[in-house]
């Protein structure tokens, strides 16, 4: 894109349902979090629910992984940093009396700093593999880095604020300047040019 349309700076807006219409919020620095996804596949050995001793239950291992993942933010991310690990989906089996061969967890992972993003990825893989091993199962993690942190450069943010003031007065700017943990693909552009 920037090869076709070279520029010195780039500007964009993201609508925010629930915020007042006709108002603007400008957040300098990290304004929106990175967004990654992970699919954790836990492999065991299926069997009959009446004979669990003859199987390796991936559902129990997956449940343990879900609980252990909750310790990453509580015990690995520094207290003044933001890290989010959410298990949004669990898929396993089709029948109540059959232990399946596999279970799958789907995660969304958010951070504002590259160091925290790296930490979250590393710990998700470590925990998934170690917890699965406790139950005699294995786990693979397909980790996908999707959207980077949206970083608003201070000089361009100040320019945007001045444009809003000139257009709408001081009331056009919301006093709130807190970053949000949603993500935005405009962040890819701001990795290349200020904005």
Model-predicted regions and their roles:
Residues 1-89, 93-100, 183-184:
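Histidine/acidic-residue-rich, glycine-tolerant segments that coordinate divalent metal ions
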